[in-house]
């Protein structure tokens, strides 16, 4: 993106402030400033912004089988995240591949691999902020079409598909930001809900992803004030979806707490909005941390570590025992050239989850080697699995009766 284009973007934003609401003014200025500072990084992605994406309309008028969230979650086995893909934060359709080590566009052949590998849940993280095109928070139609196309890949495979808002830097749970955030949450989710209101119960909406005080000292621990504000955000999400018509009145929705944290104080602060029996708790838990997520941590799994059993005991105490289902929306262990230890950890994790009928969704970011967060399972280019032993473990637990889990 050249300097003239950057200048034009900022000038257009300033001129548009004349007719914007105060909340919209703040959001657009923040977005334009962020976009300008990352213009060089995003220039390649910008080139494809106006491409037309063909969209199947085969699921726009499905018959909804009305079921409780508890019964729906009981039908789930294991899940897989299409990570670092639609959640990347560049602009245009090219954003889909901007974070990937190999620029492989998502295709149906990838999603076709999931059922045979023991997965019947597909989570599609999507970032919407850089695809908003005006002061009314309108989402780029081409981006929405592409999201729908990928959703259809999952639905066509009989998968349960989780669709969310992901790396949204515009929500910040502070009193000064709350009203503007709620305005945008309602606007974004009204559009998503309208586009997908004809889909059946296999499509699940997840309102927020790891909402937190970004860049602040309490970013990952939270504050009581921020936790309360996030409850208000979730309430706005639920009310917006329920008011959108179609099948959305009976759709199961996922609710999270501060940062989607597995810390007890953050989980216990979750207040479910008034609704029917169609709400699911979402939590992220890469455990044990030093083994699973810390790039400088150990490559040895300690089966005596209590982090995994304590997580599920807490989830049972706070939610499962009260009839509220839970999905671990993100988990996994980084590749440290330690497949045997990773298999042992995965076995213990899935066994602990199965006791409480909690499906777990692996974070696959298509990264396998190097010093970063390497959670990749699927070789998207060659349509193979990098770690067959891990996949065999998923397949085993997909067939396991939760009541028999040890």
From Swiss-Prot:
Keywords noted in UniProt: Carbohydrate metabolism, Cellulose degradation, Glycosidase, Hydrolase, Polysaccharide degradation, Signal
Positions of the UniProt region annotated as Disordered: 30-62
Pfam families per record: Cellulase
Top-rank lineage group of the source organism: Bacteria
Cellular component, GO, one term: extracellular region
Compositional bias per record (Polar residues), positions renumbered to this chain: 30-41, 51-62
Catalysis performed (reactions): Endohydrolysis of (1->4)-beta-D-glucosidic linkages in cellulose, lichenin and cereal beta-D-glucans
Any one of the GO BP annotations: cellulose catabolic process
GO molecular-function term, one example from the UniProt record: beta-glucosidase activity
Signal peptide segment: 1-43
The UniProt record lists the keyword Ribonucleoprotein: no
EC numbers, comma separated: 3.2.1.4
Active site location: 210, 330
Family, as annotated: Belongs to the glycosyl hydrolase 5 (cellulase A) family.
Name the UniProt record assigns to this protein: Endoglucanase 1
Gene name tied to this protein: Eg I
